[in-house]
Amino acid sequence: MNSNASNTPIAIGISQIFPCSYLDGQQEQLLVIQEETLDPILFDRLLAIGFRRSGSAIYKPRCPRCSACQPIRLPIKEFTPSKRQKRTLAHNRDLTWRITSEHTEAQYALYEKYIRERHFDGPMFPPSKSQYEQFLFCHWLPATFIEVYDGNRLLAVAVTDTLPNSLSAIYSYFDPDEERRSLGSLLILLQCRLAKLQDKEFLYLGYQIDANRKMSYKRLYRPYQILTPQGWEYSQVC
């Protein structure tokens, strides 16, 4: 693959086959890019063909017998919150939010609590600072943090990549004690708001996996587009 910006070839490798972390009984294999020459412009283009970031590595599923992972994005100029999403925004009007590039101990403490209480049965448990940094941070693209506060108390964080044409939602976490606030939904809505304020065309949400309940919520944000073999297509779901 060539970067249009520099015409420098980009090497794409393929991982070994290993058990899928999302679907029981399935096997996973990834196309992986780990290049020092990556930059936000090129990554924006890679997002548009289905790649995703984890740390400094860029990957895309290429599983031997499964195609359940569907790249999904929101066209920001067309996105309209549903009635339920509007209620979530209204219910959280007492909270404040801010954008920062600063990585803080409070962010990590909240992440640790979230993983210990919500994902103690998953591959990210037990949490550690080194795992957190390797998963979320990238040497060629500074992360953007959307922080949500109740007074001075940090309630939720969305880690987001800011790119020339889009935002990419990397990971979100929140205080499990505040489940009634639907903070996960609020963080997606705030990322949509930020994308609109920054005049971005898309918010990339990663992969939609219908067969995994924890990964199927992304279809609730409409209209959305799914990457198919024919290109990006709007959902037919009303």
Swiss-Prot record:
<comment type="similarity">
    <text>Belongs to the R-transferase family. Bpt subfamily.</text>
</comment>
<keyword id="KW-0963">Cytoplasm</keyword>
<keyword id="KW-0808">Transferase</keyword>
<protein>
    <recommendedName>
        <fullName>Aspartate/glutamate leucyltransferase</fullName>
        <ecNumber>2.3.2.29</ecNumber>
    </recommendedName>
</protein>
<dbReference type="GO" id="GO:0071596">
    <property type="term" value="P:ubiquitin-dependent protein catabolic process via the N-end rule pathway"/>
</dbReference>
<dbReference type="InterPro" id="IPR016181">
    <property type="entry name" value="Acyl_CoA_acyltransferase"/>
</dbReference>
<dbReference type="InterPro" id="IPR030700">
    <property type="entry name" value="N-end_Aminoacyl_Trfase"/>
</dbReference>
<dbReference type="GO" id="GO:0004057">
    <property type="term" value="F:arginyl-tRNA--protein transferase activity"/>
</dbReference>
<dbReference type="InterPro" id="IPR007472">
    <property type="entry name" value="N-end_Aminoacyl_Trfase_C"/>
</dbReference>
<dbReference type="InterPro" id="IPR017138">
    <property type="entry name" value="Asp_Glu_LeuTrfase"/>
</dbReference>
<keyword id="KW-0012">Acyltransferase</keyword>
<dbReference type="InterPro" id="IPR007471">
    <property type="entry name" value="N-end_Aminoacyl_Trfase_N"/>
</dbReference>
<dbReference type="Pfam" id="PF04377">
    <property type="entry name" value="ATE_C"/>
</dbReference>
<dbReference type="Pfam" id="PF04376">
    <property type="entry name" value="ATE_N"/>
</dbReference>
<dbReference type="GO" id="GO:0008914">
    <property type="term" value="F:leucyl-tRNA--protein transferase activity"/>
</dbReference>
<dbReference type="GO" id="GO:0005737">
    <property type="term" value="C:cytoplasm"/>
</dbReference>
<comment type="function">
    <text>Functions in the N-end rule pathway of protein degradation where it conjugates Leu from its aminoacyl-tRNA to the N-termini of proteins containing an N-terminal aspartate or glutamate.</text>
</comment>
